[in-house]
């Protein structure tokens, strides 16, 4: 399933489920561009991180936006014990070595989130920088919401960091509400953020907007 839409000034966008075969590298690059600052201490350098992410994607745990056949955005989600980004502890140690890999595993553990029964957890949205603010994120969120409904989930949950107010504003427009903020000042110097807000949206609800503003 998927959707077609026309974004302001960008032409026809197609939203599809799953990562197309052969597009793993492109997805990893977009993901790293969006989340590299946060994930950098665990996966740097970029020339090692991007191939690692690409090699360990669960390609059925994403919805992608395409423009003229090229992926310009994606949203990952976690359900049924699997998320978009994978990679076992053994894979991390193979890629980075045992000495340097152990502390990376500890950092990656900070980002682990498990859905409660009836929840689908979103792993964040990554959009091509040239197309941000043109409706791509809204289309991706609504497709994830459709996935959640089909899986009989009651709600969608996500976390947003305090240094990404634009993403939080988008989530609020699409019907998410903040339920808890965890202040983590001890992580600011290491990961670049000092608070994480958990947001939820009931499945079957949303906003009346069709596009990002």
Language-model region placement:
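A short beta-loop-alpha structural element at the N-terminal edge
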Residues: 12-29, 40
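Conserved acyl-donor/pantetheine-binding loop and adjacent beta-alpha core of acyl/acetyltransferases
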Residues: 81-120, 187
């Amino acid at each position: 399933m998927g959707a077609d839409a026309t974004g302001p000034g960008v032409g026809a966008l197609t939203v599809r489920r799953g990562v197309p075969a052969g597009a793993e590298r492109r997805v990893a690059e977009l993901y790293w561009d969006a989340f590299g600052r946060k994930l950098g201490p665990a996966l740097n350098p970029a020339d090692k991180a991007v191939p690692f992410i690409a090699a360990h994607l669960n390609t059925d745990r994403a919805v992608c936006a395409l423009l003229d056949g090229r992926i310009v955005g994606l949203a990952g989600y976690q359900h049924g014990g699997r998320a978009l980004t994978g990679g076992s502890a053994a894979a991390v140690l193979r890629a980075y070595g045992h000495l340097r890999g152990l502390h990376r595993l500890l950092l990656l553990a900070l980002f682990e989130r498990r859905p409660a029964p009836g929840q689908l957890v979103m792993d964040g949205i990554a959009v091509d920088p040239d197309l941000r603010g043109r409706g791509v994120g809204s289309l991706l969120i609504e497709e994830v919401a459709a996935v959640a409904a089909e899986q009989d989930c009651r709600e969608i949950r996500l976390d947003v960091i305090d240094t990404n107010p634009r993403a939080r504003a988008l989530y609020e427009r699409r019907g998410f509400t903040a339920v808890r903020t965890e202040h983590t000042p001890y992580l600011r110097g290491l990961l670049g953020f000092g608070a994480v807000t958990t947001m939820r949206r009931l499945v079957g609800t949303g906003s009346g907007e069709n596009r990002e503003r």
